[in-house]
Amino acid sequence: MATLVEETVPVKNAAVAASAFRLTVEADGLAVLEFDTPGEKVNKYSRPVILEFDRILDGLAARSDVKALVLISRKPGIFIAGADVNEIAKADKGADPEMIRGPHRTFSKLANLPFPTVAAIDGACVGGGCETVLSMDWRLASDSPKTQIGLPEIKLGILPAWGGTTRLPRMIGLAGALDVILAGKVLDARRAKKAGLVDEVVPAAILEEVAKGYARRKIGSKKRSNAGPGGGPVRVREASLVEKFLEGPGKGIVFSKARASVMKETKGHYPAPLAALSVVEKGFGAPFDKALEYEVEGVGTLIGTPTMRSLVGLFFRMEEVKKETGVEALGVGVVKPRRIGRVGVLGAGVMGGGIAHLAADKGLPVRMKDIKPEALALGYAQAARIWKEKLKKRRMTPGEFSRKMSLLGGSLDYAGFETCDITIEAVLEKMAVKHAVLAEWEKIVPATAIFASNTSTLPITEIAANAAHPERVVGMHFFNPVYKMPLVEVIYGKKTDPEVTATIFDLAKRMGKTPVVVKDSPGFLVNRILGPYIAEGARLVLEGVDFTAIDKAMRAFGMPVGPIELLDDVGIDVAAKASETLSKTWPDRMPQDPALERLVTAGRIGRKAKKGFYFYESERRGGPDPDAYRDLGLSSPSKNSSPSPSEIQQRLILPMINEAAFCLSEGVVASPAKLDLAMIFGTGFPPFRGGLCAHADALGAKAVVEALQKLAKEKGGRFAPAPLLIEMARTNKKFFA
């Protein structure tokens, strides 16, 4: 079609020197609005961009030649990433409500355009991006895996306040909307269509062409974006009888169940889901404009709070990782990672099978090796089980399942490993075994191949000691279960080539993980800091404290599990071995734990043996096993030893802060920000507290040092504060300025 008009609207702002939008109107009245923020990798809404969009909508509404509109992005893999998080981060409590009401007006203008509107979504369409398309009549999404649509604001400690909390329930129904809003979910195109969030899923290569044709066919059709009650959107699918009941007389049941679910999930530590639920509850069925005002009120209670600041800080740290190569702190200049095309895995047990599944899931061919056929079978079965679960939930097609399974291969020898760019070993955690498999492997692979050890405690430098090429030996420590835990520690030894470190860092990101680079040191970072947490928990039990009270206190603090539950989960024997490793290096600060040794001697090693501190069989499952006290040489918890929850929390958290300070002083990790990222993603340290160092800042260095000195006097020298903390207390410094 011939083009009648092409125009841009420049924004007079230093941050946006040129127009973020380009409008084209074709001869038949089809307008195409392209979003392409200059100088940015993603489209996002800063205040100037919102103002520009607003002016364009005013212009479109006044035109008589426009018959339909298609909104499309020119950023590869990105539709609209939402609001500029930098602006959110700067907002204080009681921030100008115009930052919410302004976009409300803009998106209402979009909804009220006097002609049909179609969103052509290719790539991330989240937050304000999703709220944009909720204000349009029809939504088409590409089948690209990068196309993700949803409202993740809850994960930033706020709520979808640009119309999302109001429009989504009216459009797709109450239950489906709450599922997205309260969990901060983003959906792929297929799931978004099933939810009613998009109308069609289209091959990415022809999305624009299809969207234009779709919009032309809708010329003259009744609008959906403002034809619902009070000027809101219409419901895209007719409600079932059950839905009609639950959105009418029975809606109290829906909100009651949702509130109970939120409390179970968050323990009340995160105010945003409850605030969002309240906004939906008040706004659902209210006049549309009034419902939007509830969003203004609701988000106003969340902006600038400590929880919001902690979660936004976490977001920025994750964004930094995406841009990094992993060697910035090593002082080696610019290093490009190698591209990994094929992965080998030595050891096909629980960890090895999990790593093989993860690599194949990201499209990498994998070759597994084990000395036992049954272990290889377990590796295959583990991958199949995870994929079958996705298949069952319709998050994967049968064809995708078959393709991914075909990427897995296995053998009892090294056949095929000569073509692997990297081999990840997950064999027995014994140095002699690591040395043996490394020596065997080096005989059959080219000099360019990388050997990555999944060891959790053994020094990488020592593993590489006898290697012909120690520069290609590196640590790649996954956490169990591999498919769930987001952290990977990338550990460089004394001779590890920075290019190898950068390659593992890049591979971890390709696998969907968050990598943190760590210097070779006993326990590395996470297990070293976690050591005192577990050890002090066990010592409290030996002192006669009820272990269920210890776990309860730490869950109340925000930890996902208490130290005693964690012992059962990781294996008491594994924890005892880690304690032995750490105590060899720091005998005064981390003396070997006698409680763990006693339990291992008694055969009480945790969940895997169905014999730990808790029951794992019969009707008593999950309850405390009183015989654990007997194996520790105790008759039962002492009635004379019942510290308060806050005393338990202090006893367990302060040594972690102390060890974090030692790690930073020794250069084990580059910064407090990286340390906090590792502790949140590796241990589940409560994100609402911002991380271990952020929590220490909230307490204040002086208070931390005084509390540690008091504990050192009462309980022993292992609590002696780190020199870094003492200096911070003296100079009134913080980990984060």
Model-derived segments and their meaning:
Residues T3, A17, F21-D28, D36, ...:
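N-terminal glycine-rich phosphate-binding loop for ADP-containing cofactors
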Residues A2-I72, G94, R101-G102, S108:
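Conserved CoA-thioester-binding segment of acyl-CoA-metabolizing enzymes
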Residues A68, P114-P116, Q148, I450, ...:
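Proline-centered loop/turn at the N-terminus of a beta-strand
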Residues P48, A62, K75-K90, F107:
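Amphipathic alpha-helical interaction surfaces in cytosolic regulatory modules
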Residues L71, D84, T132-V133, A192, ...:
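Hydrophobic/aromatic residues within transmembrane alpha-helices
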Residues R74, H104, S108-L156, P160, ...:
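Glycine-rich beta-to-alpha active-site loop
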Residues P76-I80, V126-G127, L458-P459:
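Short, active-site-adjacent cap segments at secondary-structure transitions
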